């Protein structure tokens, strides 16, 4: 026999909020539109999930189920006999699981095309057929929302819609979608709205997320994140982090920081010309060398008195020069030779005279 608690994956003491969360998770998991390759199994599971939610979400039905099981809901007690007064004397009839699903999601089936108005119907003027004839398919638009967090009481489980495309001027087109959901109470409330504009051939998408009192706005251009603000203030760190998460390059920052580098060179210019005057002072040492030249002696020699000059001339006459000495000695030698020659001749004459005698 099927255990409804096991079908939803909750404990027997689970709260009504836990029952809702469990149904949302299991219904989206086993919806036939999401399981085209295993449709029969998905339909069986989807039906069990709807039955479990119908019983466990109603306090009276849950109490009977806890006491007598599913048979108590069918109008009979256990042990083959009727031992209690069942409020469902003729048995409880389960509703269509699709009806349960649509009711849970605000009266509309998120997997049907009726839930998402085709934005191109009115724009191109060719509806694909009556709303009731639109069939579900594996490529259902809602499959993108299967990862949304739990819905809570007090809010529609899921609410979204599109406005048809329309002209905005300058060849622009626009669409809009929104979603809101929350947990228990207002603390976990989250709202997402997305608007898309096609202006001058560029697709501008603005995504606004409001969660726990904080507003986050992301603006994309042709799929590239261009700006991100939190509570109306641009957050460059959050923008860079989101771009890294998406694997996109971080857009160029605003021109605000650019002037800062431009000021640095202007401030650095005055110090650089400072060393240039130093080489200009190098010729200074040439001026200092002029006083070191001694006075010329010529002017002092001209001022010597005439008497001193005459005394010097007399001294020069008294002292023979170096050139005179060699001439005197040479003369003496020559005179000595002539004298000896003459003496020899005289002696020869004397000898010859003696021999004659």
Swiss-Prot record:
Signal peptide: none annotated. Has a stimulatory effect on the ATPase activity of HSP70 in a dose-dependent and time-dependent manner and hence acts as a co-chaperone of HSP70. Plays an indispensable role in the organization of KRT8/KRT18 filaments. Acts as an endogenous molecular chaperone for neuronal proteins including huntingtin. Suppresses aggregation and toxicity of polyglutamine-containing, aggregation-prone proteins. Also reduces cellular toxicity and caspase-3 activity. One of its GO terms (molecular function) is protein-folding chaperone binding. The modification Omega-N-methylarginine is found at residue 136. Residues 3-69 form the J domain. This is DnaJ homolog subfamily B member 6. Transmembrane segments: none annotated. It is found in: Cytoplasm, Perinuclear region; Nucleus; Cytoplasm, Myofibril, Sarcomere, Z line. The keyword Ion transport does not apply. One of its GO terms (biological process) is regulation of protein localization. Residues 120-243 are annotated as: Interaction with KRT18. Residues 252-282 have a biased composition (Pro residues). Gene3D superfamilies: DnaJ domain (1.10.287.110). Keywords: Chaperone, Cytoplasm, Methylation, Nucleus. Its main location: cytoplasm. The keyword Chaperone applies. Highest levels of expression found in brain and retina, and lower levels in heart, kidney, liver and placenta. Homooligomer. Interacts with BAG3, HSPB8 and STUB1. Interacts with ALKBH1. Interacts with HSP70, KRT18 and PTTG. The lineage of its organism: Eukaryota, Metazoa, Chordata, Craniata, Vertebrata. PANTHER family: DNAJ HOMOLOG SUBFAMILY B MEMBER 2, SIMILAR TO DNAJ HOMOLOG SUBFAMILY B MEMBER 6 (HEAT SHOCK PROTEIN J2) (HSJ-2) (MRJ) (MDJ4).
């Amino acid at each position: 026999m099927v255990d409804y608690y096991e079908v939803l994956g909750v404990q027997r003491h689970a709260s009504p909020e836990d029952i809702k969360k469990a149904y949302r998770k299991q219904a989206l998991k086993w919806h036939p539109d999401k399981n085209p390759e295993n449709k029969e199994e998905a339909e069986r599971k989807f039906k069990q999930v709807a039955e479990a939610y119908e019983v466990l979400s109603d306090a009276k039905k849950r109490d009977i189920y806890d006491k007598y099981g599913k048979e108590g809901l069918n109008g009979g007690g256990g042990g083959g006999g009727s031992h209690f007064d069942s409020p469902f004397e003729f048995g409880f009839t389960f509703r269509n699981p699709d009806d349960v699903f649509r009711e849970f999601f605000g009266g509309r089936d998120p997997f049907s095309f009726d839930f998402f108005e085709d934005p191109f119907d009115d724009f191109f003027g060719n509806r694909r057929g009556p709303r009731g004839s639109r069939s579900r398919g594996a490529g259902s638009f809602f499959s993108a929302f299967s990862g949304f967090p739990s819905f809570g009481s007090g809010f529609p489980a899921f609410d979204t819609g599109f406005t048809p495309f329309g002209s905005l001027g300058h060849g622009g087109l626009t669409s809009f979608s929104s979603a809101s959901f929350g947990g228990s109470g207002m603390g976990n409330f989250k709202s997402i709205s997305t608007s898309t504009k096609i202006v001058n051939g560029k697709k501008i998408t603005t995504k606004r997320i409001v969660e726990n009192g904080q507003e986050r706005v992301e603006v994309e251009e042709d799929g590239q994140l261009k700006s991100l603000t939190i509570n109306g203030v641009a957050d460059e760190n959050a923008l860079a982090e989101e771009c890294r998460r998406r694997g996109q390059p971080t857009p160029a920052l605003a021109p605000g920081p650019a002037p800062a580098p431009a000021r640095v060179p202007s401030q650095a210019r005055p110090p650089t010309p400072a060393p240039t005057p130093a080489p200009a002072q190098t010729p200074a040492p040439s001026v200092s060398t002029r006083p070191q030249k001694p006075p010329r002696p010529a002017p002092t020699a001209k001022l010597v008195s005439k008497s001193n000059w005459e005394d010097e001339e007399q001294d020069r006459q008294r002292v023979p020069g170096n050139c005179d000495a060699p001439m005197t000695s040479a003369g003496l030698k020559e005179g000595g030779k002539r004298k000896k020659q003459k003496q020899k001749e005289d002696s020869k004459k004397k000898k010859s005279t003696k021999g004659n005698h």
